[in-house]
Amino acid sequence: MDKKIKLAIIGFGNMGTGHTANIMDGKCPEVDLVAICDINPKRIEFGKEKYPDANITYFTDAIEMLDSGMIDSCLVAVPHYDHTKYSIECMNRGIHVMCEKPAGVYTKQVREMIAESEKHPEVVFGMMFNQRTNPVYRKMHELVHSGKYGEIRRTNWLITNWYRSQAYYNSSDWRATWAGEGGGVLLNQCPHQLDLWQWICGMPVKVQSKIKYGKWHDIEVDDDVTTFVEYENGATGVFITTTGDGKGTNRFEVQMDGAKLVVEDDKLTVTEFEVKESEFTKTNTEVFGSIKTHNLEIEIEKTNPQHIGVINAWAGKILHGTPLIAEGAEGLKGVILSNAMHLSDFLGREIELPFDEDLYYEELMKRVATSKKKENVTATFADTNGTYGGAKL
């Protein structure tokens, strides 16, 4: 019998349920799901009813499960504040860990998690950045980093197809609260795009944001964000997102010295310049001269494995030493971006990176202190397929 990892899942909510379904459907052939933990007894009963013949042991205490000796790997899919807590508990026991996005709520706790992982090199630590498996973004990353088109001039990402109604925010007592979730659209939906943005374009050095909290919904946290950034080479970028647009847009544009790259409607368009702009502007003699361009035919892989691909790559790393989709330490960069965006709006000014992480934590805790606990909320769970807001094939 081929060797498999012995997996546990902590958190049997929307994401944990989705991962379980993929594994039980046989889409992760090197994964044996042996344990599931959730503090809600109703979720345990749901699992037993859904998979009555499965050899899965259920727990309501995560530490008891981690100490059971049954598992060698764990997928952490709990509310955001506890991502680092349970990932560290896994590392301390030599258990391989896959952390759902975001890596944490604030950078200080993510740095602690990464520092702990460095003490345990035997542990395979991965991040659930499933959009890195999307072939259009992988190709965009390849082209931007090839050096063929020179430096980035400008980046723009309009990612407003994250629409959520009030029912979504009412589905859990922790959701969309400072104390329970630690943020809104930036921390819940946009970790995917913030990761891709920095993965493809690099990290900015300055951030300035205008954020609205509960603009479109009855919530405490952000549901409308406009951010301006500057990069070390002088390039600029804009990032706009919301969960309030009834019909949103997902358009990511990177303007370079020698080309323009756009991802929209699940397609990558590359407009190549016959002469780089930096050369053309110096040598052109026509008053209204313009650069000649042509569109490239870009061959894109047809497979887009998303969460399944991330889990299979993680199992492959554990069993065979093959590469991960995203190392665990990669989770820090997106949290830096979301924290910087929040801090800019909290203080009403531009933020330079690296920023004062203690100050961010203080500002966050002010909001946690006044966060209102939701009363009489019945947890509601739903199929998350098709809700990820990224390009799909």
Show where each model-derived region lies.
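Short, conserved SAM-binding/catalytic segment
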Residues: 46-54, 113-120
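Conserved SAM-binding strand-loop segment of SAM-dependent methyltransferases
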Residues: 55-62
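Contiguous beta-strand/loop segments that form the cofactor/metal-binding neighborhood of enzyme cores
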Residues: 188, 194-277, 301-320, 324, ...
